[in-house]
Amino acid sequence: MLWKRWTLAVTIVVLQLAAVLLFARGFLPSRVLLPGYTESRVSTEAPFQKAIIMVVDAFRSDFAFSDQSNCPQLHKRINSGGAIPFTAHSTPPTVTLPRIKGLTTGSTPNFLDAVLNIAESDNSSTLANQDSWLAQASRDGRKIHMFGDDTWIKLFPGMFDDCEGTASFFVSDYTEVDNNVTRHIDTQLDQKTEWDVLILHYLGLDHIGHKTGPESPFMPAKQKEMDDIFDKLYNSCDDDTVLILLGDHGMNEVGNHGGSSAGETSAAMVFASPKFETAQLTETAETSPLPWTDTYKYHSRMDQTDLVPTLTALLGLNTPKNNLGVLVSQMLGLWSPEDQLNVLKNNADQMVQILQGQASRESDAKEVYELYDTLNSNPSVKDYYNFLYEAQSYLTHASSNYNTNDMLGGIGLGLLSTILALTVFSALTLAVQGLKRLYLIILLVYFISVFGSSTVEEEHQIWYWITSGWMAFLYISGSRNKFGDGFNWMFVQVFVRMMISWNQTGQKFTKKDDIVTWLSKDGNHPVLWILILVTYGVAFNKVWRYGFSKVESKLAFLLTLITTFASVGFKITQAWEAGEVVPAPLLYLMGLPGTLNEVNARMAGLARFAFSTIAAGSLYRVLSLAGTDKVNLIRDLHAFLTLFLITQSRIQNIPLFMVYYFLEIFLRKATNRSFIFSSRDIYQTEALFQKLVLVLSVSTLLLEQVSFFSMGNSNSMASIDLSNAYNGVTLYQIEFVGVLTFVSNWIGPLYWSTAGLSFLLEDHVRNAIFAKIAEKNNDVKLTTKLVQQALTLRVYVVLAFSSVAISAVMITCFFLREHLFIWTVFSPKLLYQFVWTVLQFALVDVILSSIFVVLVYRSV
């Protein structure tokens, strides 16, 4: 029976994976695009012959235009009329690859591009066969040179006459990655006849944001560096060259991006040329800098896709076939009144072709067609813009090409896995109907919450209340017989409250004060580092007592000291390199400061050494399985995992592991005292057994959810943390970076997953009680059987939740696929749930649990 249930568990996992893949195929298809290239020739004279495109990754509008920016040369050019500034709206997902697609083709990228964005070697997103302003320039015989982010080379293979790429995801480096671009400038400016378009894409500012946020002490210097480069390029321009400075997206308050907040969607865009100073393109003179505002709206507003028809018109190129951008009106002064109408006509004729491919005249696009018809008789500039903006709005918000059959098929498989998981779960918990009903209510509450955009954005609030309520229920039920037996639950609640208060997340309260904010304030850094060192002391004790417990005592102490010191040294060096305040004695201990290259090399070496010793110790412990030692395997591996997870954490989150440690202790004590020592039914094996397993399994599952959000995560792609994704990595390798990215963002769930296994399999009090039960029943193998059954029930607790969760999210995305927030709220939630389902629940909680069953309890 046991192995049948495990076979069914594997079947449920397969059903979930199939559901995810099938639904994704239907929900995330590529947008239908018009094939081919625009062939008609532009009849108007081009104001410029050359263009320099300077992309500063994550160049938020306030970095360029506010009184808090450090770009004096840019402000000077704006005030003189030589530069025309805009705040350019970046349509989510606000990550580099889809934004470059939008900036070159003029079309709105598919949300799947956000997933492909992290695959450095991915070629599925190439634009080699799509129309873009680069394709039009190349077909017109123009020469294009590109230096910087290698995403351009992946998107446009073979299109550059000269190029050199830099790795866009190696966020640990923000100096050399920009120097490798700047070193080409002098040569390129001296050889202007060799190119018609020069593209420079700088990544350093974005990397600083990922590492230390927009208020990093390194940010002003980086802005000044970009400003100096802009000034150098501007001074090299003649009246035939236009310089465009832009950000591909912005960043949020912590330096990440991918979501839809004002900071992430507000990028800087500047058109500059000496010709503008005499052309007087704007009616009123622009002034810069402007007062900082949290709306990030400065100067005129435009959509990023508007760059495409504007640039092609400025260079005398055809507008790409799938462009949804509108030529910015501020540039019209460069043409005669007659040519102004001609360039707008080109834009309108191109856009109406897309409209004809997506909607008939009898559809809801009828009013847009009527505006186009008015252009047939003496149209004015205003008439053209009326049509262009209405067409842009309609086409931008037009429905995606969903495959509803695949979506329904995925939902069907998800519901089937839910039915199977809940059926077996119910059969395994017949003796604890009350607890089972409460868990099912939790699943129902979560299922309902997924249908609200606000509850998805603030999901952490759901788990905070559910977890606190669950622990309160256990406190009440555990102290019915003797009040003192429930005393430990009070400490459990205290530490849960500390987890909740550690990081503010979500959308509504992200700027509210939390524990991390207090620890980061001036004057409080000594407290932070004391807590960090105490946490490392706790981790040292766990690794020494448990991780190297099978090694001779003195050698174990030495190995633990070396392993822990490597991790501590790495975090100290990483903090200093990121601009954090580090106490002088710790800097002296690590021989800091030093040159940047020395520090980076030292960091990589320390991280690799720490990882190697942790891996070696874990491998030794697995290979040393023998006799009764096997029952402590998970506890010992959990000690090594804790040190690894600390190494992968942000500095401010390291003390959370001390909170986890004490919560783990009190949760273990609370369950033992409340449900074993105080139990009146000590010999009622089934009821006691099911109660214990369900209490611990649900508790640790809830703590997985709470700990995920307590680390500062959310359901927004902007909260993905890349600051520890390159620890120990010197060259970009998607396999290692992918694993480290998952680990550094799922730290809490990984911790509580292994802690939950240890609770069930290796608690000596519980096993002693089970031994007594076995003795009472005259069955010497009953203890091992109970442990195996406990693991089985835990797996089905997880499968019940994961099946309900993925089904709920897929159903939500199906019925709300026309919702205003489908791409900004529900689609990111779907991607997060995919990761939860495939990596955390299926791989970690189910498959690894199965491996432990085989490794540790093979005797039955």
Curated annotation (Swiss-Prot):
Enzyme class per UniProt: transferase
Keywords from the UniProt entry: Endoplasmic reticulum, Glycoprotein, GPI-anchor biosynthesis, Membrane, Transferase, Transmembrane, Transmembrane helix
Protein name per UniProt: GPI ethanolamine phosphate transferase 2
Phenotype of the disrupted gene, per the record: Defects in hyphal formation.
This protein's record includes keyword tRNA-binding: no
Pathway: Glycolipid biosynthesis; glycosylphosphatidylinositol-anchor biosynthesis
Recorded family membership: Belongs to the PIGG/PIGN/PIGO family. PIGG subfamily.
Topology term for the membrane: Multi-pass membrane protein
Entry GO CC: endoplasmic reticulum membrane; plasma membrane
GO molecular function: CP2 mannose-ethanolamine phosphotransferase activity
Matching PANTHER family: GPI ETHANOLAMINE PHOSPHATE TRANSFERASE 2, PHOSPHATIDYLINOSITOL GLYCAN-RELATED
UniProt lineage: Eukaryota, Fungi, Dikarya, Ascomycota, Saccharomycotina
Function as written in the Swiss-Prot or TrEMBL entry: Ethanolamine phosphate transferase involved in glycosylphosphatidylinositol-anchor biosynthesis. Transfers ethanolamine phosphate to the GPI second mannose.
Localization, UniProt: Endoplasmic reticulum membrane
One Gene Ontology term from the biological process aspect of the record: GPI anchor biosynthetic process
Transmembrane annotation, as ranges: 408-428, 438-458, 459-479, 487-506, 524-544, 555-575, 576-596, 639-659, 692-712, 736-756, 795-815, 834-854
Annotated glycosylation sites: 123, 180, 672
Name of the gene encoding the protein in the UniProt record: LAS21
Protein EC: 2.-.-.-
Pfam name, any one: Phosphodiest
InterPro entries xref list: Alkaline_phosphatase_core_sf (IPR017850), Phosphodiest/P_Trfase (IPR002591), PIG-G_N (IPR037674), PIGG/GPI7 (IPR039527), PIGG/GPI7_C (IPR045687)
